[in-house]
């Protein structure tokens, strides 16, 4: 939900491209939630919803990317460990592997954005997100 809210904040600030990127990311995440829920049900598991840890919303786009990158790094590391434990369940492994690839792509985008900001400056980069 955070990505959707952040996207709406960025759009309201006039950064339409950046806002859409995070709203689209939220929608992708919901697609993954559906796939994992379906798999849990297929395996006879019980679906639970546990509230997510609260995260502050950040109005500065660059600061948000930096904070999100740290969360992405930890998440990708965790997904690698999860993949290792799923080697005997090829169907779930394939879903997790595809999810990991999607999350890595997001991580690389964040890293690339921060590298670009370093090269051309924050104001110039923000202008590209209008």
Predicted regions and their residues:
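Iron-associated oxidoreductase/ferritin-like identity signal
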Residues: 1-130
């Amino acid at each position: 939900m955070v990505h959707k809210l952040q996207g709406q904040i960025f759009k309201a600030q006039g950064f339409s491209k950046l806002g859409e990127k995070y709203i689209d990311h939220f929608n992708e995440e919901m697609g993954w939630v559906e796939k994992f829920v379906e798999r849990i049900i297929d395996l006879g598991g019980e679906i639970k919803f546990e509230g997510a840890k609260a995260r502050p919303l950040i109005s500065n786009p660059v600061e948000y990317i930096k904070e999100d990158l740290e969360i992405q790094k930890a998440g990708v590391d965790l997904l690698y460990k999860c993949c290792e434990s799923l080697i005997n369940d090829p169907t779930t492994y394939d879903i997790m592997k595809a999810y990991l690839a999607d999350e890595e792509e997001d991580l690389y985008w964040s890293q690339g954005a921060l590298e670009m900001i370093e090269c051309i400056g924050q104001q110039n980069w923000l202008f590209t997100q209008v």
